């Protein structure tokens, strides 16, 4: 899943 949107998959910080 492309972490384009700051979710909780790869982008824990979010933004």
Curated annotation (Swiss-Prot):
GO molecular function, one term: glucan endo-1,3-beta-D-glucosidase activity
Keyword Disulfide bond attached: no
E.C. designation(s): 3.2.1.39
Catalytic activity: Hydrolysis of (1->3)-beta-D-glucosidic linkages in (1->3)-beta-D-glucans
Entry keywords, A to Z: Glycosidase, Hydrolase
Enzyme class label: hydrolase
Family membership noted in the UniProt record: Belongs to the glycosyl hydrolase 64 family.
Protein name as annotated: Glucan endo-1,3-beta-glucosidase 1
Taxon lineage: Eukaryota, Fungi, Dikarya, Basidiomycota, Agaricomycotina
């Amino acid at each position: 899943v492309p972490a384009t949107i700051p979710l909780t998959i790869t982008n824990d910080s979010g933004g």
